[in-house]
Amino acid sequence: MHVAVVINPISGARGRPGVARRRAELAAAVLTAEGVQHAVQVTERAGHAYELARQAVAEGATLVFAWGGDGTVNEVGCALAFGSTALGIIPAGSGNGLARELHVPREPVQALKGALLAAEQVIDAGEIGGRLFFNAAGIGFDALIAARFNSRTHGRRGLWRYCTVAARELFTYEAREYTIAVNGETGYHRALLIALANSRQYGNGMVIASQAQLHDGALDLVVVEGRSPLAILWEARRLFMNTLPSAKGVIMKKAQHLTVCAEAPLLFHVDGEPVVGGRSLTARVHPGALRIRRPA
């Protein structure tokens, strides 16, 4: 086995010195003790995790760990998708959506050792606007919150920060008109957000699509229609209660392929990373596109 570890020194450690060195030393020590051939790399910029993972694949890695948050996992996953190299996760972000869905331990040594011993599995990948995602994507309000949340370059970025940003933006955000073509039907919606879920949750235990499965060959489309800010805030508690399907103005469907159109360019996110797209976005699922290893 040849293992590579790609470390994001910023994830979960903004402003703390020496994090990259400590994480690299820990990973190297664990893999050396396990007798595993390895390479440990630290990212230096956005997009670097993808480059390092591609390099690891070219050098014969059979397992590449992403040590970071959802964005780091997305970059490494994109580098490994449709190939024979498996993804391992050492969660260190603010949401850790895919890691939570896979029940990956937060403790780095447990995550490392557990994945080394685990059997490989495959999960689906989603695609929207030409960008792959493995946990969730979204259009509208949740994409705006992702952009606002990620613009914070220092300090803590946990659940409280996310909820604070969302609550503040909710009172000025206007729902938009969308045309959604899915499963041979076309619908028109004035929506707060349109989520595409590969897994059940955004992260931090916020369940957006309770019926989603990582290996069912489908995406879960969730449309949250526009309502008053106070009504949305009241219903938002259901994200933490796993009861969102019971909320008024929430539409859910399984889909393999869909198109979303609007009159203005669409802001969307892939695994929490915001992207500005055109006025039409096509989304699809790629069944079994990514190999993973997770602790049993």
Give the predicted meaning of each segment.
Residues I10, A33-E34, T43, A81-A86, ...:
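Catalytic core of DAGKc-family lipid kinases
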Residues S151-R161, G205, S210-A231:
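Gly/Ser/Thr-rich active-site loops/lids in small-molecule metabolic enzymes
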Residues V182, Y188, Q213, V223-A296:
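ATP/nucleoside-binding phosphotransfer catalytic cores, i.e., glycine-rich phosphate-binding loops
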